[in-house]
């Protein structure tokens, strides 16, 4: 009996020790403009981190930057407080990651949407143009006016990459289609300006577009309001946004930031972290389009079938999607 009790105590202590070790793994998440409630890019990152907290037992703290000057001090604060992994969400954090990672070489860092070459930094990159191509094809197959729209957030190469892929996919289906494109601004505020998103979308709808794809962070929510007013279709981005305006969000271009964030946390915690670039595309479902109970009645089966055929052709290399980064 005593031997059994000693064994039970040993197992219990071992369990507590293991739980403590896991709980001691600390992750600091620095979100971009718009914050975790943007229902898009940041929301996806936050979802991946909270899933890691739930499943892996990590300690998680997130902060929302109010302007670009805040990124570096926020990251440095995490590093100084002995966080094991610090994740920056968005290309605007590239310079901050470069500086802080160099100052704390024993810490692990990750960044979404920017390439930082350092042994302790993982760059999480996505083939947005591939996903946008499929979305463009879906928009063109659904349009009855021969005009579709694109509302981008900040006018930067990343969003131009979305736009280029979107237009190429639309023209694959209808070479004569007109693609209207506008951007919400040239500063970080462009990601969190729903009134501007709505203004641009209304103008595009009133110019004849009947489907609009948004790649604008929280500003895209304004475009969804415009879709509701005009009773036209909009397309979401990054997270599955079909639920936000049921019957009006035709689909969403999924960019699995949540998956990338979860994976890098898991690898860092388990001692398998390596620096370098990890890319996510159609082949590994890093980008895709959404189908669920909110859009299955408006996203026609014939459209889905053709979209899936195009996905297969891209993965097989039969279609090479134009890439703004390589133009």
Q: Which residue ranges define each predicted feature?
A:
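Positively charged n-region of N-terminal signal peptides that target proteins for export
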Residues: 1-6
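Bacterial N-terminal signal peptides
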Residues: 8-19
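A residue-level marker of the well-folded mature domains of exported/periplasmic proteins
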Residues: 23-327
């Amino acid at each position: 009996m005593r031997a059994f009790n000693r064994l039970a105590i040993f197992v219990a202590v071992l369990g507590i020790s293991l739980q403590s070790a896991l709980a001691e793994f600390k992750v600091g998440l620095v979100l971009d403009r718009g914050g975790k409630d943007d229902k898009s890019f940041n929301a996806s990152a936050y979802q991946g981190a909270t899933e890691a907290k739930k499943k892996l037992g990590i300690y998680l703290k997130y902060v929302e930057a109010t302007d670009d000057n805040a990124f570096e001090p926020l990251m440095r604060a995490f590093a100084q407080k002995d966080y094991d992994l610090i994740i920056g969400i968005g290309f605007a954090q590239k310079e901050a990651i470069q500086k802080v990672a160099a100052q704390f070489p024993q810490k692990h860092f990750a960044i979404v949407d920017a390439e930082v070459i350092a042994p302790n930094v993982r760059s999480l990159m996505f083939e947005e143009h591939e996903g946008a191509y499929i979305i463009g094809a879906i928009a063109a197959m659904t349009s009855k006016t021969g005009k579709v729209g694109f509302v981008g957030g900040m006018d930067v190469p990343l969003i131009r990459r979305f736009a280029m892929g979107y237009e190429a996919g639309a023209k694959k289906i209808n070479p004569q289609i007109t693609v209207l494109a506008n951007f919400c601004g040239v500063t970080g505020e462009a990601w969190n300006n729903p009134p501007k998103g709505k203004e641009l979308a209304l103008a595009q709808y009133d110019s004849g577009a009947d489907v609009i794809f948004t790649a604008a962070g929280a500003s895209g929510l304004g475009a969804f309001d415009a879709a509701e007013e005009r009773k036209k279709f909009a397309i979401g981005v990054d997270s599955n946004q079909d639920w936000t305006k049921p019957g009006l969000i035709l689909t969403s271009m999924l960019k699995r930031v949540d998956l990338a964030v979860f994976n890098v946390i898991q690898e860092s915690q388990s001692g398998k972290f390596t620096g370098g670039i990890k890319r996510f595309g159609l082949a590994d479902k890093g980008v895709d389009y959404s189908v669920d109970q909110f859009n299955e009645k408006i996203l026609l089966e014939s459209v889905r079938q053709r979209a899936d055929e195009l996905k297969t052709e891209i993965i097989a290399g039969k279609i090479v999607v134009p890439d703004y980064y390589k133009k």
